[in-house]
From Swiss-Prot:
Pathway: Amino-acid biosynthesis; L-lysine biosynthesis via DAP pathway; (S)-tetrahydrodipicolinate from L-aspartate: step 4/4. SUPFAM superfamilies: Glyceraldehyde-3-phosphate dehydrogenase-like, C-terminal domain (SSF55347), NAD(P)-binding Rossmann-fold domains (SSF51735). It is an enzyme of class 1 (oxidoreductase). NAD(+) binds at G8, A9, A10, G11, R12, M13, E34, G98, T99, T100, A122, P123, N124, Y125. The lineage of its organism: Bacteria, Pseudomonadati, Pseudomonadota, Gammaproteobacteria, Vibrionales. HAMAP family: DapB. This is 4-hydroxy-tetrahydrodipicolinate reductase. It catalyses: (S)-2,3,4,5-tetrahydrodipicolinate + NAD(+) + H2O = (2S,4S)-4-hydroxy-2,3,4,5-tetrahydrodipicolinate + NADH + H(+); (S)-2,3,4,5-tetrahydrodipicolinate + NADP(+) + H2O = (2S,4S)-4-hydroxy-2,3,4,5-tetrahydrodipicolinate + NADPH + H(+).
Amino acid sequence: MVRIAIAGAAGRMGRQLLKATVNSEKAALGVATERSESTLIGVDAGELAGIGNVSIAIVDDLAKAANDFDVLIDFTAPVVTLANIELCKQYGKKIVIGTTGFSEEERVLIDLAAKDIAIVMAPNYSVGVNLVFKLLEKAAKVMGGYTDIEIIEAHHRHKVDAPSGTAIGMGEAIAGAMGNKLSDVAVYAREGITGERTRDEIGFATIRAGDIVGEHTAMFADIGERVEITHKATDRMTFANGAVRAAVWLADNQSGFYTMQDVLGLDDL
């Protein structure tokens, strides 16, 4: 049984992760953390998640609970995640990262940490989204050279980063399949007289509204036809279940940088 720690347990994803961990047949909840100023310190994690008492109280010091978990799942903020990575390095723990919005410099730090500990990092832990990434690679190889490629994503009003990590992941999958680097071909905003689009650019459009859990569409548009590959999430539990699955998988692997493609074995398709 893999003992899991949940960082940011009181957040929207944190509560779903608590449920997914407790409901898993292969994992057990070992630790649940929150910020030191949180009024929820000391509250039972199960009560917080609405699943009843689990005899695990919310704590504010992950280091003091280092003996109580094997893998940390972190869906928080870049500054918090980077600090938790250092803690995992110090105590020889493994980490599943669902946080998005890292800078290129911060991504380098994560890559370096993977030389010492095992890390799974993905922009999205849904099985369906990760299958979409693979489908996009296939579509880009067949259609990318002669179509206009656009990515449209929609999320709830509270999401703080844009485009979403999943949208960027879609762009990276497409660009990589075409032998390009996303940063060289991405267009994140259009306004005013922009002129005609170039053939090689990948455009992004972002919607923030209401309570949309997550919707992503990649469009390959030609004259006379277009192909759209879409994923719609209606419940955050799909992300939480995928993250717990990744944590269980990671427990059996050595130091290195892994993605959900590795967890699901999609690289073999």
